[in-house]
């Protein structure tokens, strides 16, 4: 291992040790399941905002999105536009009412518990169904984060992908196991800050060191359709984007209102005043980070010449940010330790999502399944033990799913995002804003949304292709629409909610 690599490694080791120390500190402060899952509802504005956005964006922000733009051009920015719109609507429209409603609904600690309490589901159908959906789709989502970590260590240090996968999984498991929600949120705050600094600094410095015009360098790199097409958001190589392609990318924004690991941040903020501050901080962070990630894909295509990623044995396009940092700080500026810190920003993005996903899955398994169905008289410490064991089991299963080094980060994230967004998004929105929504409608929404995504993405029904591949339409858009329609139909076709349920709704709505 070269001297430069050793310096970068020292930055990684220092960073990983800091995360573990945070886990140890908060392990001592975590004595109950409410502490472990929601931090005692004590998050301040900055921690809530940055932890929500960091856990949202994941390695996809620093690897998947820049890689897609690097390969296909700025037409991929419509995903970023959709995500920004979704973020704004989630913070402005969903966060305040969800926080109030989860407190009014028997102080619900998780999204499945909230849905059960919201509709007074005595048969526990919603709790069981929601928990199963979370475990299934979060396994895939967590696997995407672990795969990103494996690719990071493999690219930077030349470590075998599978060994790298194990290292990343072990560290994330360690501090999530120990500290629970507060450890995850504090580490996510650190990680969200580091991500944003890296996103802003690296493309700017790389642009200033370009040895020619951006347009000329893009043409030399073999950009699809030439520089003009590459920089045109309405072009896909040598042809215009279709309406369906743009709509499908914008539809990513629909997923936000169905993401349990993001929604729990709203539930955990300590006051309405702090939540308002969080909204502003989160939206500003989102604008800056998404814009910078898009520029990484564009500038990276020119900056890395003569290397063209994805060709002639070079790294995949999803490694564009990693390769930029290595070239900029190790080769051009001779500052490998600083480069190592920025590479930790990528690791931060990966870890911030994986830890949140592990925690949500643990809460679904321990609080919503074990406590409610297996041992109802379990005390808080026993639930905490089950949660920690769940973190271990889920980590191992996600590790197995991520074992293939050719796994696409973008593909894994896309499928998991669609499944969770379609299953929970419409149900959460309607439960918060439509008084007539009832138990039958909520069940129909979750089942139809989740199944639509599975059928659309995995079952070849059209000339040997899946409907997603055949139509080019993102499964989240279809699943969200189907779920919304089913909620309305089943709610209107069955008995209206009781007065007790509507009284709580009216209280939360301020009527």
What is the predicted role of each segment?
Residues 1-511:
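Membrane-embedded helix-loop-helix hairpins and adjacent transmembrane boundary segments
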